[in-house]
């Protein structure tokens, strides 16, 4: 496992963003783990998380001109990554959207950099059903931008349904024709649990969950 994947999973565990046990997901599935990016709730945690995102996107080779964070969770994540990239000497424009368009002041739905004619990278926490990401793709195209790729924190690598054996991330990647990468995945989580004495007991439930719902890695 690469260093940034291990650092991210350790950070998520420390922040209580990654929890193990039994959790009922929105899909109704009983999952042995749960990820909540909202737990990265301090300047220090977001700074470290931004570095993990930056490492992942640098390793991917995706070319882009603007960083875009979909409302709401994507906004601090994209901001943290953009700040980290600036520290590394790459100061990129940043844009994000409102859930509701304003009809006063500067107006509109978008805040930040102009995306017209630019390659745009979407930064978010996870892709669950893909609804929010598809909305972001539409917003970028309507603003004259070209979606260049998507980076998320965690890829659960599980099928959407019994009739669609792709994950939500795979579906979005195929439909949009752009790469979807993750800082870490379920496969990484299994490796991480195996190497952590406090988590090794969760490996069997994780393996069973992957056997029932897993898909091939997208990275």
Swiss-Prot record:
List, alphabetically, the InterPro entries matched: OPRT (IPR023031), Or_phspho_trans_dom (IPR004467), PRibTrfase_dom (IPR000836), PRTase-like (IPR029057)
What are the UniProt keywords, alphabetically? Glycosyltransferase, Magnesium, Pyrimidine biosynthesis, Transferase
Q: Give the E.C. number(s).
A: 2.4.2.10
Locate the residues binding 5-phospho-alpha-D-ribose 1-diphosphate.
26, 72-73, 98-99, 102, 104, 124-132
Name one molecular function that GO assigns to this entry.
orotate phosphoribosyltransferase activity
Q: Can you supply one Gene Ontology CC term for this chain's record? A: cytoplasm
- Can you tell me which residues bind orotate? 34-35, 128, 156
Q: Does the keyword Transferase apply?
A: yes
List the catalytic activities from the record.
Answer: orotidine 5'-phosphate + diphosphate = orotate + 5-phospho-alpha-D-ribose 1-diphosphate
Give the pathway. Answer: Pyrimidine metabolism; UMP biosynthesis via de novo pathway; UMP from orotate: step 1/2
What cofactor does its activity depend on? Mg(2+)
Q: Which Pfam families match?
A: Pribosyltran
An example GO biological process term is: pyrimidine ribonucleoside biosynthetic process
Task: Spell out where the chain crosses the membrane.
Answer: none
NCBIfam families on file: pyrE
Its subunit composition reads:
Homodimer.
The record's similarity note reads: Belongs to the purine/pyrimidine phosphoribosyltransferase family. PyrE subfamily.
Describe the task this protein carries out: Catalyzes the transfer of a ribosyl phosphate group from 5-phosphoribose 1-diphosphate to orotate, leading to the formation of orotidine monophosphate (OMP).
Record protein name field: Orotate phosphoribosyltransferase
The species this protein belongs to is Stenotrophomonas maltophilia (strain K279a)
- Quote the gene name from the UniProt entry: pyrE
């Amino acid at each position: 496992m690469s260093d940034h994947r291990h650092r991210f999973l350790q950070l998520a565990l420390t922040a209580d963003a990654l929890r193990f046990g039994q959790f009922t997901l929105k899909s109704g599935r009983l999952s042995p783990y749960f990820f909540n990016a909202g737990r990265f709730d301090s300047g220090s945690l977001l700074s470290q998380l931004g570095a993990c995102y930056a490492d992942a996107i640098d390793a991917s080779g995706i070319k882009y001109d603007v960083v875009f964070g979909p409302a709401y969770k994507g906004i601090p994540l994209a901001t943290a990554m953009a700040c980290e990239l600036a520290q590394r000497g790459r100061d990129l424009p940043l844009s994000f959207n409102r859930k509701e368009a304003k009809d006063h002041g500067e107006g509109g739905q978008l805040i930040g950099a102009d995306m017209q004619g630019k390659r745009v990278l979407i930064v978010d926490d996870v892709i669950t059903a893909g609804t929010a990401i598809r909305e972001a793709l539409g917003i970028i195209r309507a603003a004259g931008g070209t979606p260049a790729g998507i980076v998320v924190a965690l890829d659960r690598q599980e099928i959407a349904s019994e009739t669609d054996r792709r994950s939500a991330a795979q579906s979005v990647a195929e439909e949009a024709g752009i790469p979807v990468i993750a800082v870490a995945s379920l496969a990484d989580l299994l490796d991480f649990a195996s190497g952590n004495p406090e988590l090794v007991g969760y490996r069997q439930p994780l393996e069973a969950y992957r056997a029932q719902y897993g898909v091939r890695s997208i990275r």
